[in-house]
Curated annotation (Swiss-Prot):
GO biological process, one term: cellular response to iron ion
PTM annotation, UniProt: Sumoylated on Lys-10; which inhibits transcriptional activity.
Ranges of compositional bias, category Polar residues: 414-427
Keywords: Activator, DNA-binding, Isopeptide bond, Nucleus, Phosphoprotein, Transcription, Transcription regulation, Ubl conjugation
Protein name (record): Transcription factor AP-2-alpha
Purpose of the protein: Sequence-specific DNA-binding protein that interacts with inducible viral and cellular enhancer elements to regulate transcription of selected genes. AP-2 factors bind to the consensus sequence 5'-GCCNNNGGC-3' and activate genes involved in a large spectrum of important biological functions including proper eye, face, body wall, limb and neural tube development. They also suppress a number of genes including MCAM/MUC18, C/EBP alpha and MYC. AP-2-alpha is the only AP-2 protein required for early morphogenesis of the lens vesicle.
Top-rank taxon: Eukaryota
One annotated GO molecular function: DNA-binding transcription repressor activity, RNA polymerase II-specific
Similarity comment: family membership: Belongs to the AP-2 family.
Species name: Bos taurus
Residue(s) of cross-link: Glycyl lysine isopeptide (Lys-Gly) (interchain with G-Cter in SUMO2): 10, 177, 184
Region span, H-S-H (helix-span-helix), dimerization: 280-410
Cross-link (Glycyl lysine isopeptide (Lys-Gly) (interchain with G-Cter in SUMO)): 10
């Protein structure tokens, strides 16, 4: 009985194997029922292509790095939205409606909360918030936020502007190129702006801002003085009548010679809005005054005036010249000539005193006519502030000589005519007696 049961099992097993071989498919799942096999069953090797590929599900905090082609919130007035002219073709990607709504609502309310690594992929990265411009890490003063647009100087680079009703940017954040007047109350706040061409405020130039400090050339080593060179002074040195080139300007500013010294100087000037083309030729002849900055030239003129006022031997020169013209017949004529010369010198010094040429940080309003003022300004620009004060000091020394010469002539006349002195005393005594009566 047991032998027949064993034969039936073997016979059924052979039929199963034969059927599997004839049908062309392996009956592997049925073999797994036999406990004698040491191997486990394997899944069927088959691949069914699926046209609708579903991306894996991500939780809501995940932000898709690809831009969405369709925006359900396009009707919202977003100040950071791009103009249609700047839009780029974007690939079509299927999205999840529920997840996109939560993401778009989060982007509208927390636009600044995006991860730092996604900021470079945002096509709107060139548009910045005006709060960041006024209070961001640019070194801007707190008082700059209250400045109106007319209180800011012009910018070097213009921001391209495209009319778009979707862009709503306040006027206070737009900097336009053009001459703008600076008020005294806002000059300190504007001068605190760092000059950097890469930033939005890179073109802001304050003429009174210090460009650099230059050590004096005429001072002793024991008392070296430094003079501040403003942006306005550099602009005057690059403008007519001097028109300095990069080499001469570098020497005036005491910059060390290097291989790329001219290029670095031009780049530094370009940041403050001054253009210095390469290969430029100077317009004026180089003199010793060319090496002086305005501060040192004015200092030299002031010291020269002090020396002329205190040390010039006006009295000794007047007495010496009067002895050479001691003829009594010439004294009256000579005295009239001295008086006329003194009057001419006074008119000349009064004219120079009305000179209002720009110098240093000052640009006073002109008093003289434009024709004569332009000539005086030309002379002042060539001498860098030394010319007019030095001429006034020299003419003042001449006036002191004329005054001493008139005094010496009066003494000489009285010494040569003692009777006239007694007659004058008698006349004065008679007048006093009549006044007493």
């Amino acid at each position: 009985m047991l032998w027949k049961l064993t034969d039936n099992i073997k016979y059924e097993d052979c039929e199963d194997r034969h059927d599997g071989a004839s049908n062309g498919t392996a009956r592997l799942p049925q073999l797994g029922t036999v406990g004698q096999s040491p191997y486990t069953s394997a899944p069927p090797l088959s691949h069914t292509p699926n046209a609708d590929f579903q991306p894996p599900y991500f939780p809501p905090p995940y932000q898709p790095i690809y831009p969405q082609s369709q925006d359900p919130y396009s009707h919202v007035n977003d100040p950071y939205s791009l103009n249609p002219l700047h839009a780029q073709p974007q690939p079509q990607h299927p999205g999840w409606p529920g997840q996109r709504q939560s993401q778009e609502s989060g982007l509208l309310h927390t636009h600044r909360g995006l991860p730092h690594q996604l900021s470079g992929l945002d096509p709107r990265r060139d548009y910045r918030r005006h709060e960041d411009l006024l209070h961001g890490p640019h070194g801007l003063g707190s008082g700059l936020g209250d400045l109106p647009i007319h209180s800011l100087p012009h910018a070097i680079e213009d921001v391209p502007h495209v009319e778009d009703p979707g862009i709503n940017i306040p006027d206070q954040t737009v900097i336009k190129k053009g001459p703008v007047s600076l008020s005294k109350s806002n000059s300190n706040a504007v001068s605190a702006i760092p000059i950097n061409k890469d930033n939005l405020f890179g073109g802001v130039v304050n003429p009174n801002e210090v460009f650099c400090s230059v050590p004096g050339r005429l001072s002793l080593l024991s008392s070296t003085s430094k003079y501040k060179v403003t942006v306005a002074e550099v602009q005057r040195r690059l403008s007519p009548p001097e028109c300095l080139n990069a080499s001469l300007l570098g020497g005036v500013l005491r910059r060390a010679k290097s291989k790329n010294g001219g290029r670095s100087l031009r780049e530094k000037l370009d940041k403050i809005g001054l253009n210095l083309p390469a290969g430029r030729r100077k317009a004026a002849n180089v003199t010793l005054l060319t090496s002086l900055v305005e501060g040192e030239a004015v200092h030299l003129a002031r010291d020269f005036g002090y020396v002329c006022e205190t040390e010039f031997p006006a009295k000794a020169v007047a007495e010496f010249l009067n002895r050479q013209h001691s003829d009594p017949n010439e004294q009256v004529t000579r005295k009239n000539m001295l008086l006329a010369t003194k009057q001419i010198c006074k008119e000349f010094t009064d004219l120079l005193a009305q000179d209002r040429s720009p110098l240093g940080n000052s640009r006073p309003n002109p008093i003289l006519e434009p024709g004569i003022q332009s000539c005086l300004t030309h002379f002042n620009l060539i001498s860098h502030g030394f010319g007019s004060p030095a001429v006034c000091a020299a003419v003042t020394a001449l006036q002191n000589y004329l005054t001493e010469a008139l005094k010496a002539m009066d003494k000489m006349y009285l010494s040569n005519n003692p009777n006239s002195h007694t007659d004058n005393n008698a006349k004065s005594s008679d007048k006093e007696e009549k006044h007493r009566k």
